[in-house]
């Protein structure tokens, strides 16, 4: 950061209020933004962290329609859930507001009117699908049809979620309205467009020449868009949910959500600072930083800056440290498939472990490429790093001090060369941390913070104060004094990353007033004689059973998705009725059932068929334990010729249905019948 700014305005992408937030949102946007804001505050810098819910647009209208309620009821419910979830994880917003607020409606309308009156829009007429039964134009998500690329017959007008291809509504084969189910027709409609091509020369110079320090993934995506050439982009659409376009002749039209949403950063700042918001948005000594995911790079690096420049009085973003995507157990996170770890559920199922999630998401952050979250890695990082390194060092330092010095910080005596080298090592952490945090390398910054705990662990292991206690208590005092100073330094270094654990550690150190960042690296944070609090476990080991339950939860979701997506096999060719009558299907009671030796798929049944009994061998051993079927009634074909399987003569075939996941389910009568009863 070459320029000297007086203040930093940090914004976070507005989460869509049609569902909860998940770990992908957190890793990509909210945890790194919170780390950065906490770091700046700790350094005494003037900064604001601005957030809020994005509450307009087609997905919310669709959600309301599906749930049989109003869009306002949908956003009211999810806005509160999202806000509580962020608070639970310690995301320290100065304000978390929403785009249905009165102040946002006014701000967005005024912004549009300013550009409209300056002649910054162009009007264009285009053809758009119209539902004649519902008497309304259809947004992309209100149209489904067959994808021309993969033949999925549930593709939307903007994207096929089966193959991931971006589409135009007119690309769909046999399009139909999701409102009425009827085939839509094309009609002309007028909209206002922001001519991005007009701003292209400025954007090329501003980004490609002026911001080469941006992350490579951000700079590269911007360059790709600029190299292709920018096109006008609609700022209005035909919809009944949103902020009405505030000009004559715009009945039934609202502001496009991509235009409306980023103005939420401005309106939320206005709401927080009604008298000073312009200082944050219009002063050249304010640094504006957008935290977003990679799907929002174009909007925040090209479109929103073009809007701000067209308005003429606002500052432009100085940096946009966008992250890539986080996957889950090797698969793309999907809200529609419920393939996610939802924050509100995590907070309920892992009480008091907010920092474990913050740690893992930061350590595994998708900063320059997509990354993967797995529950086994979550467990390993907790047990092997937070517990075994950080927590272990803190616990040993405090427990030994209580054991040998009644919990009071002992005096520091003469330092050895090893002591001095250790002090130099942990004093260097401050500069390393600052470099990584200032350049938005949060994953590397976390490694530097954890390195401080490693330094402490190594120091205790090498000096072995528990052995010296028998012969040299003065030396033990010096060792534990330095160990406690490292512990206090850990409370500072980890505050941006693990605020709950940092506060807990400060409490164990009996320090009410947090140390300032400027004291990081100091060896006199805790004065001689200062009485410590009682040591507690800073982190707890996660057992396999806890993680197994989460993995099973995902497996259940995967099975449910497979069943939902299952398509029945095509109907076989017609047969003559007489051929069907040849089958003698009967009901029998299972008397015995056992596995066939040296055959992992086969079970041997002894069946009461009402005619003296029979033996049947069936290939369902992978789907049932033998004892599950004893005493049950099953349907079987009785008039098949006997055949030998693994040396056993089988006298029939037990009927099963194959489920969507490939599992077999034996066909059983709904109520018990006499053995040998025929199925008709």
Swiss-Prot record:
A motif ('HIGH' region) lies at residues 15-25. Its EC number is 6.1.1.10. Signal peptide: none annotated. One of its GO terms (biological process) is methionyl-tRNA aminoacylation. It is an enzyme of class 6 (ligase). Is required not only for elongation of protein synthesis but also for the initiation of all mRNA translation through initiator tRNA(fMet) aminoacylation. PANTHER family: METHIONINE--TRNA LIGASE (PTHR45765), METHIONINE--TRNA LIGASE, CYTOPLASMIC (PTHR45765:SF1). This is Methionine--tRNA ligase. It comes from Porphyromonas gingivalis (strain ATCC 33277 / DSM 20709 / CIP 103683 / JCM 12257 / NCTC 11834 / 2561).
């Amino acid at each position: 950061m070459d320029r000297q700014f007086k203040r930093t305005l940090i914004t976070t992408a507005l989460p869509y209020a049609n569902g909860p937030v998940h770990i992908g949102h957190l890793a990509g946007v909210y945890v790194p933004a919170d780390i950065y804001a906490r770091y700046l505050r700790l350094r005494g810098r003037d900064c604001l962290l601005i957030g809020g819910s994005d509450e307009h647009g087609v997905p919310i209208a669709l959600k309301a329609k599906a749930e049989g309620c109003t869009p306002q009821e949908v956003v009211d419910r999810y806005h509160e859930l999202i806000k509580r979830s962020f608070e639970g994880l310690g995301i320290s917003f100065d304000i978390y507001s929403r785009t249905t607020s009165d102040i946002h409606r006014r701000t967005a309308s005024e912004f549009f009117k300013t550009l409209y009156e300056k002649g910054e829009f162009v009007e264009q007429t285009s053809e758009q699908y119209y539902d004649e039964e519902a008497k309304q134009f259809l947004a992309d998500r209100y149209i489904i049809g067959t994808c021309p690329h993969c033949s999925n017959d549930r593709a939307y007008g903007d994207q096929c979620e089966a193959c991931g291809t971006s589409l135009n509504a007119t690309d769909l084969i046999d399009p139909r309205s999701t409102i009425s189910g009827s085939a839509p027709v094309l009609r002309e409609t007028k909209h206002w467009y922001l001519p991005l091509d007009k701003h292209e020369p400025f954007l090329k110079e501003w980004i490609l020449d002026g911001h080469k320090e941006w992350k490579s993934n951000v700079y590269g995506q911007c360059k790709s868009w600029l190299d292709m050439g920018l096109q006008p982009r609609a700022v209005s659409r035909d919809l009944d949910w949103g902020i009405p376009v505030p000009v004559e002749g715009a009945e039934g039209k609202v502001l496009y959500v991509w235009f409306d949403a980023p103005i939420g950063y401005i309106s939320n700042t206005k709401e927080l600072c009604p008298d000073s918001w312009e200082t944050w948005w219009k002063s050249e000594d304010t640094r504006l930083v957008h935290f977003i995911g990679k799907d929002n790079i174009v909007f925040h690096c090209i479109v929103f800056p073009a809007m701000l420049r067209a308005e003429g009085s606002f500052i432009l973003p100085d940096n946009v440290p966008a992250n890539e995507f986080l996957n889950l157990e090797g698969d793309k996170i999907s809200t529609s498939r419920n393939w996610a770890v939802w924050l509100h559920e995590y907070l309920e199922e892992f009480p008091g472990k907010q920092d474990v999630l913050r740690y893992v998401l930061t350590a595994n952050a998708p900063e320059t490429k997509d990354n993967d979250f797995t529950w086994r890695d979550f467990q390993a990082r907790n047990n092997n790093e937070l517990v075994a390194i950080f927590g272990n060092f803190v616990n040993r330092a405090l427990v030994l001090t209580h054991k040998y010095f009644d919990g009071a910080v002992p005096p520091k005596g003469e330092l050895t060369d090893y002591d001095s080298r250790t002090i130099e090592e942990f004093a260097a952490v401050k500069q390393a941390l600052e470099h990584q945090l200032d350049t938005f390398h949060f994953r590397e910054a976390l490694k530097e913070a954890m390195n401080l705990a490693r330094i402490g662990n190594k120091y205790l292991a090498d000096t072995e104060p528990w052995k010296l206690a028998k012969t040299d208590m003065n030396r033990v005092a010096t060792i534990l004094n330095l160990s406690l100073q490292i512990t206090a330094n850990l409370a500072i270094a980890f505050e941006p990353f693990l605020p709950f654990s940092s506060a807990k550690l400060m409490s164990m150190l009996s320090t009410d007033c947090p140390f300032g960042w400027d004291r990081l690296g100091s060896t006199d944070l805790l004065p001689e004689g200062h009485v410590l609090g009682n040591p507690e476990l800073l982190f707890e080991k996660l057992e396999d059973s806890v993680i197994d339950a989460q993995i099973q939860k995902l497996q259940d979701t995967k099975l449910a998705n497979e069943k939902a997506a299952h398509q029945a096999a095509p109907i076989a060719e017609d047969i003559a009725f007489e051929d069907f009558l040849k089958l003698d299907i009967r009901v029998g009671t299972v008397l015995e059932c056992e596995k066939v030796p040296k055959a992992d798929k086969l079970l041997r049944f002894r069946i009461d068929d009402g005619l003296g009994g029979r033996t049947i061998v069936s290939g369902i051993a992978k789907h049932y334990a033998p004892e599950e079927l004893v005493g049950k009634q099953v349907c079987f074909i009785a008039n098949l010729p006997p055949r030998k399987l693994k040396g056993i003569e089988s006298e029939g075939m037990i009927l099963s249905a194959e489920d969507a996941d490939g599992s077999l389910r034996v066909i059983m009568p709904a109520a018990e019948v006499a053995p040998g009863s025929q199925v008709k």
